[in-house]
Amino acid sequence: MKQVIKLSLLCSALWLAGCGDETNSSGASTEVVYESYIQQALQRDTTIKFALSGKDANVPLPSFALMNAKDGTLEIPPGSNTSGSNPLVAMGQVDGWPITMPLFLDFKGAGLADNIITSGIYLYELTDSMTGSPSIKALLTNGVDYTAVSSAASDKILIMPTKALNASSEYILAVTSEVSDANGNPVGTSASYAALKSKNKIYSEGDIATLQKVTQGVEKIFQLSGVDETQIVYSTWFSTQSVSNTLFATRGATASAFASGSNQLETVWKQTGLGLDTAYTIQLGTPVDFAAALTADDNFSTYVGADKKTAILGTYTANTVDVTKGTVRLPYYLETGSNWNTQPFESAMPSLAKIKAALADSKEQLTIGSQLLAAGIDTTKLATDASEQLKLMGLTLTKSDGTALDPERYITRYSPVPKVKSVQDVPFLLFTPAGAAPTDIVIYQHGVTTAKENAYAFAKNLTAVGLAVIAIDLPLHGERSLDSTRSANSDPLAYINLTYLAVARDNLRQSILDVLGLRAALTLSQPLFTGTRLSGINVGTGSKVRMLGHSLGGIVGTSAIAESNKTLGSTAADAMYSFSGAAIQNSGGQISNLLLGSAFFGPKIKHNVALSASTEYKGFADAQCASLDDSACYNLFTSLATQEQLAQVTSGFQMFSYAAQTLLDTIDPYSVVSTKLNNGGLTTPLYFSEVDGDSVVPNKVSNPTGSLVYLSPQFAGTEPLATLLGLTTVNAGQTAPNATKSFVQFNSTAKHSTFVAPQDAGYADLAHHTEMQTETADFLADDSLGAVSNSNSVLK
């Protein structure tokens, strides 16, 4: 691996148990006479809600004050529920704040007006953390890089970035008295912030000393940039989370295991008995004619529908396509037992952040240092040398009291490689031109609640241009369902895990790693292809591997493509994961708002979130919804609820989306693409499409006029992702495509899955399906879209 796991100095965990305007964290109390400008700010009618202790404790998000020093994760007080089902606990497994969610500021007193705030909010990016040697890297501009909006209903200010913040980066925020309350008067500060701001009392010990030092350091940076620090009523520093580090580190560790030409996965992971020595191998069965294969395919009957076979067979020309079933052996990082939906990924290595903290602790440095030495690890290289970091794989470090140094094994930038739980024989379908062995191949990934077998509906269009198509099931789908109930085919929430958000994230992360793993297997298994329909596939001699994703498969595919654009520092390693092009249909980014804003999934998800967010809603559901499904129950509630009741459940949705996106940002396509674009361009040729008014994956998500339902929805849906990628929009008004960067918009006669097969009983969308398939085959044949036709009025 070229990239190493970056360590930064982290501030102490700062949820204080005794800090106010005159009390330090050790309990000593003294009267403090504040500077006159602080006294004035304390006496204002409307003040920031920032309290470090007591029943009204409140820290605006995001903040350095809610991070754990020893492992670099968020640390938000969870209340009584300390299980992973608590979103606040789940957020504690993340190594920084989200990059696509807003910043929150709560106020109390006279209140705020509904307003766009044009002055008094300052947001800067720093070169280093506040415990290092920071300087200003970028001055973000209000109205350009972010917008600040105040709400009379909630007395909140939301600061919404217009583009994703940089991952693994440091930011500081300041609010000054230029911001006005509902009466036009300047907002003020809180007692807790006054204690940190004042120079009349400097704390020398305890957590409050660290808080004060950081706060005054932040204000000093703003002062040097021209902001009057005497007018600052609140400031903070925060670190953003890493994005796609686990994808990168897992690719790098895998590539290093094959660097010698043989499989050394067991040596690298230090895990035996799981079958890692045969991982990334492909086994193929005997080719069968398409018609015979589909007719006999019970999985198609189960997961797609036996009634759909006749229509597909009716469009098939006999003896033109072969279907071969087979398996690819892929590492599985999720659980399959009783904890399948409660246990997220676990790291294969102890956290570098915890090791760093232990080596700085006089009580632990000898104990931990000697174990590292015994493992052949040079601690002087550990922070910067990727090969040295790999030596931590499979290692358990024990503290002087006999307990594990890192029992949680959270996946973070400090411990990014996941532990393998099993090696699975993942079934696939391979479609090839009859009797032929194509030189190029397309990996297809289906959408949520369906299965790989839906490729039967369109694969012949790709084989007709000389391509092979290989399709696998997403985790917990199709043949990869754990059983009939632990299956997204019976309940999408088996995959979209709303109860354990870290598992929901890792279901998606596993899916991306599966695509990358299948891609690697197509390179590593090449010697096994002799005499099979894959005998023509040899990446080393010029074979091209392309990606095709629909819906959730497109979400997975987009993140996989963006990740594959990052070099591992070795031509051979990069060749294991390269894609020459990608076609993404009806997909999008910022998954939490995408789902909440989905006409199809939104009501079901809102119902399940509201059950825990609102006792009134739960009471309503218990009384009124015994015979209704989840979506119908929620829709009935919205038709009957008061504005106050709707506001309560909406607040719950906002809390859920913030927590969910905090977990998802690390692998969300919008975040992964943004991070890649910030570190060099995305060079893979792309073809995207959408249908107008898509009911499953929304084109975009926006708040109703005058209300705030979704947080930072400007990143959610298909169109924001297409815009981020710089794609050329093609529609009825502009039919000339960009060969390698097109985004084609179809009109609303087409439906979400028209790409797979016509959805209208009267075939009103048949022409749309045909054009979608024609364009996709055209693009995937050579990574270039030649033409788009609107002769049948299919475009928006």
Swiss-Prot record:
One of its GO terms (molecular function) is lipase activity. A lipid is attached at residue 19 (N-palmitoyl cysteine). A lipid is attached at residue 19 (S-diacylglycerol cysteine). Keywords: Cell outer membrane, Lipid metabolism, Lipoprotein, Membrane, Palmitate, Signal. InterPro entries: AB_hydrolase_fold, Lipase_bact_N, VolA/Pla-1/cef. The keyword Lipoprotein applies. SUPFAM superfamilies: alpha/beta-Hydrolases. It comes from the Bacteria. It is found in: Cell outer membrane. Disruption phenotype: Mutant cannot grow with LPC as the sole carbon source. GO terms for biological process: lipid metabolic process. Residues 1-18 form the signal peptide. GO terms for cellular component: cell outer membrane; membrane. It is a lipid-anchor. Induction: Induced in the presence of LPC. It holds the Pfam family Lipase_bact_N. Belongs to the AB hydrolase superfamily. Lipase family. Required for the utilization of the prevalent host lipid lysophosphatidylcholine (LPC). Functions as a lipase that cleaves exogenous LPC and generates free fatty acids, which are then transported into the cell by fatty acid transporters such as FadL, and used in various metabolic pathways. This is Lysophospholipase VolA. It comes from Vibrio cholerae serotype O1 (strain ATCC 39315 / El Tor Inaba N16961). The lineage of its organism: Bacteria, Pseudomonadati, Pseudomonadota, Gammaproteobacteria, Vibrionales.
